[in-house]
Amino acid sequence: MQLETQDALYVALELVIAALAVAGNVLVCAAVGASSALQTPTNYFLVSLATADVAVGLFAIPFAITISLGFCTDFHSCLFLACFVLVLTQSSIFSLLAVAVDRYLAIRVPLRYKGLVTGTRARGIIAVLWVLAFGIGLTPFLGWNSKDRATSNCTEPGDGITNKSCCPVKCLFENVVPMSYMVYFNFFGCVLPPLLIMMVIYIKIFMVACKQLQHMELMEHSRTTLQREIHAAKSLAMIVGIFALCWLPVHAINCITLFHPALAKDKPKWVMNVAILLSHANSVVNPIVYAYRNRDFRYSFHRIISRYVLCQTDTKGGSGQAGGQSTFSLSL
């Protein structure tokens, strides 16, 4: 099958995003595994996020490419490809929310934080979030799908009897997953609420940090702390902004498709392609925002790349610069 120019460009960009997502997030997982200083509850959530983003690069993006080309297959195989994409992206969203809640607890109740957020509890929360992601992503298999419409023209040769079980359909996302599910359940129920909650949490974090800083005497140490907290607040605001930038366009298009089908019918194909690329690109920037701006992660990245990529001998001892208290300090 020969690809049109814009389809070929879309596939090429998706493959680049997939490669970057896998490389960056594997590096995050390796850094946590290699450094005892990074093995904290906060970073367990980051590893969950990185794992979801690795899976986006390895599976979700190839599946998205496959269903964008519209090849013919049976309905449930196509539905599985579409739903698996939803499972992984939903897991990534939940992991982002878990990190936000974890950071709020760390700054709101610092003295009780270690007792509240233990490694065992963090792993349990991660397991629950993945189960929820699978439940949400696979909901169309319970009947909320477009099987009747997609297989309405299927008949057995000669007798005219409808046979929907083995009917080949053109495997496009909108042919198997109804927009009502994507808008009402996925967007309004599972994407928009976490986004709004994260915005509120990060605003709260900023307010608590500012309130604490107002009670500090501006000595040299206090000035350094103030600069670090301001930098952290800016980084947290950037997290919310990138999340919205990456995810809202594709859901906005879905809303237009559902509520204004006549308008959506004439939309250029490249518009949806760009929106999908943006949503997948979130898996690339997550390691940059959450990990690359952390001093301990950078040190561990340097060691891993030097030893296993550049094959250089490690001449420095130790496991990093910091301990558990500054696990997610965003200072540079």
From Swiss-Prot:
Keywords per UniProt: Cell membrane, Disulfide bond, G-protein coupled receptor, Glycoprotein, Lipoprotein, Membrane, Palmitate, Receptor, Transducer, Transmembrane, Transmembrane helix
Stretches of the chain found on the membrane's Cytoplasmic side: 34-43, 102-121, 204-235, 292-332
Cystine pairings recorded for this chain: 78-171
Positions on the Extracellular side per record topology: 1-8, 68-78, 145-178, 260-267
Residues annotated to bind adenosine: 174, 254, 279-280
Residues carrying covalently attached carbohydrate according to the record: 153, 163
TM stretches of this protein: 9-33, 44-67, 79-101, 122-144, 179-203, 236-259, 268-291
GO biological process, alphabetically ordered: adenylate cyclase-activating G protein-coupled receptor signaling pathway; cGMP-mediated signaling; G protein-coupled adenosine receptor signaling pathway; mast cell degranulation; negative regulation of cell population proliferation; negative regulation of collagen biosynthetic process; positive regulation of cAMP/PKA signal transduction; positive regulation of catecholamine secretion
Main location: membrane
Compartments, record wording: Cell membrane
Function as written in the Swiss-Prot or TrEMBL entry: Receptor for adenosine. The activity of this receptor is mediated by G proteins which activate adenylyl cyclase.
Similarity annotation: Belongs to the G-protein coupled receptor 1 family.
Protein's UniProt name: Adenosine receptor A2b
